[in-house]
């Protein structure tokens, strides 16, 4: 399910629209949207008040926090000293929520600053799995693409061993869409992406939806610009039925590495990408061209 709201209206809006919200074809149990939003709101308020005791109750065992500089901390590291959330209490932020079965996602934004929080349904309730910040560029990027025409990694091989059929299918879908990007084949790319797809990158100045990404691929085709994606360095998948969270490290052909959180969903029998948040790791050395 997909919903759009501001936190200042969470409680009243949730119940006022409980029977009128639009549906995603990915299954979501009745009430899960409300439960995700309520947990998320309480978590954000605890963070804004620097209430570590309250905030810690929401953290999943696999929790990770990535800030706008690309620094990532584990649950244990966060518990030692909670980071300061870039959007504060988010009272003036635009918030979008989507629930995919046992995975809930909340995206908050104010201007160029974006935050993704991924929630997972555990026996004890909804728990925060990922907190990922992105601060976008003030101006459009100067490069039209990577400038590279050949794609070995990730199009043909990846340094990752899937542990089950779902992960194998996701890798195959991902390789197919990245092959489409490299070949400037927008149709091939679009087959593996959800209609509600969004990409938020610290290497761009605005969010990119499905139509926007297709337009970029077509422009690169017209110009002949090399557009091979950045090779994968490492990946970790967390499986939750018909939704999988994929956390990756990429090293572009030039520049600094990128921390990426992707959400994959199984819809109409196939795996497609729904969300991609990408943050450059500022403290890492840059690769020379």
Across the structure, where does each feature detected by a protein language model lie?
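Surface-exposed, charged secondary-structure patches
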Residues: 35, 76-116, 214-258
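Positively charged n-region of N-terminal signal peptides that target proteins for export
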Residues: 1-7
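A short gly/proline-enriched turn/hairpin at secondary-structure junctions
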Residues: 59-73, 84-87, 196-208, 219-223
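Hydrophobic pocket/interface hotspot
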Residues: 43, 54-55, 63, 78, ...
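A mature extracytoplasmic/lumenal domain signature
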Residues: 59, 69-70, 109-111, 117, ...
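Short, low-complexity N-terminal intrinsically disordered segments enriched in polar/charged residues
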Residues: 23-61, 129, 135-191, 195, ...
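Bacterial N-terminal signal peptides
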Residues: 8-21
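Short beta-strand edge/turn micro-motifs at domain boundaries
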Residues: 114-155, 257-284
